[in-house]
Every structure is written in C-alpha cells, then in structure tokens.
Amino acid sequence: GLFDIVKKVVGAFGSL
C-alpha cells in the first residue's frame, strides 16, 4: 500500500 512506499522512502533516507 501507500504506507509501504512511505516506509521504503523513509528507509532510503535513513540509509543516508
């Protein structure tokens, strides 16, 4: 769902 996409984006930023 949309929330899954949001979490994926947040995870990507967290990897920075």
Swiss-Prot record:
Q: InterPro entries under this entry?
A: Aurein_antimicrobial_peptide
Alphabetical keyword list? Amidation, Amphibian defense peptide, Antibiotic, Antimicrobial, Fungicide, Lipid-binding, Membrane, Secreted, Target cell membrane, Target membrane
Location relative to the cell: Secreted; Target cell membrane
Q: What is its main location?
A: secreted
Molecular function GO labels: lipid binding
Q: Does the keyword Cytoplasm apply?
A: no
Instruction: Decide whether keyword Amino-acid biosynthesis is in the record.
Output: no
Please provide one cellular component term from the Gene Ontology annotations of this protein.
membrane
What does the tissue specificity note say? Expressed by the skin dorsal glands.
Q: Name one GO biological process term.
A: defense response to bacterium
Tell me the residues on which Leucine amide occurs: 16
Superkingdom of the organism of origin: Eukaryota
**Pfam families this protein is in?**
Antimicrobial20
Residues that span the membrane, as ranges: none
UniProt PTM comment? C-terminal amidation enhances antibacterial activity. This increase may be due to stabilization of the alpha-helical structure at the membrane interface.
Q: What else is known?
A: The primary structure of the mature peptide is identical to that of aurein-2.5 from Ranoidea aurea (AC P69019).
UniProt lists the family membership as follows: Belongs to the frog skin active peptide (FSAP) family. Aurein subfamily.
Purpose: Amphipathic alpha-helical antimicrobial peptide with moderate to potent activity against Gram-positive bacteria, Gram-negative bacteria and fungi. Also shows a weak activity against biofilm of both Gram-positive and Gram-negative bacteria. Probably acts by disturbing membrane functions with its amphipathic structure. Kills fungi via membranolytic action. Enhanced sterol levels in lipid composition membranes reduce interaction of this peptide with membranes, having a protective effect against the lytic ability of the peptide. Shows anticancer activity.
Q: How does it assemble?
A: May be monomeric or may oligomerize as homodimers or homotrimers in Gram-positive and Gram-negative bacteria mimetic membranes.
From the Swiss-Prot or TrEMBL record, give the protein name. Answer: Aurein-2.5
Q: Which organism is it from?
A: Ranoidea raniformis
